[in-house]
Amino acid sequence: MSELGTVIVTGGASGLGAAVAQAVAERGGTPVVLDIKAPSSGFEWEHVDLAHAREAEAAVRRVADRHGGIDAAVTAAGIDSCGRIEDVDPEHWDRVVAVNLVGTAAIARAAVPYLERCCGRIVTVASTLGLRALSDATAYCASKFGVVGFSRALAVETAGRVGVTCLIPGGMQTAFFDGRDEQYKPPPDAVLAPPEQVAETVVFALTRPNGTEVRELIVTTSTESSWP
């Protein structure tokens, strides 16, 4: 898939998702943002709450109907709710898993039939905390460990028909950490990756020749402490 075509990007209104949408557009692709917020970029947008799986699936089908199919999907939407498991509001805990894991699966479920027609690709977004556990992050770790496992199983299931890449990024310079208690923010000396640089790796995965797969990408700064 050397040409990007129509690319669905969840979470494309901010952070990594916005950087991916911009990178896709700069390379001649057509990004379509699925997000609860409208992107400031002016890219085509579907209002979607990824916590509602059927809503997410319907949005994918609407995009495919408008564009005559889709060529790729990037599931960059992600949220967190920090704290000890007994202290986190259960509805907040459940929403983290719903958005990060179930939302990812919903996008894939709806997208795969279209991607199979064109040997398209899907890039799921996990985290280094999908490989390494951290206290006070049970919801996030559960969801991101789940994304890693889901992506590996999906790659087996769709082998030869759809390219599946799991991106495993470390901390990035986004609003993801805003609004947290200080104890849950990166330390002042933490070096975080610019999302634009991480987005370049997503485009790299999307543009591999047919038959060549980038199965997993661990992308961090050289001083990242969360992996290994």
Per-range role (PLM):
Residues 13-14:
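Conserved glycine-rich cofactor-binding loop
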Residues 113, 155-157:
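Alpha-helical segment proximal to the catalytic Tyr-Lys
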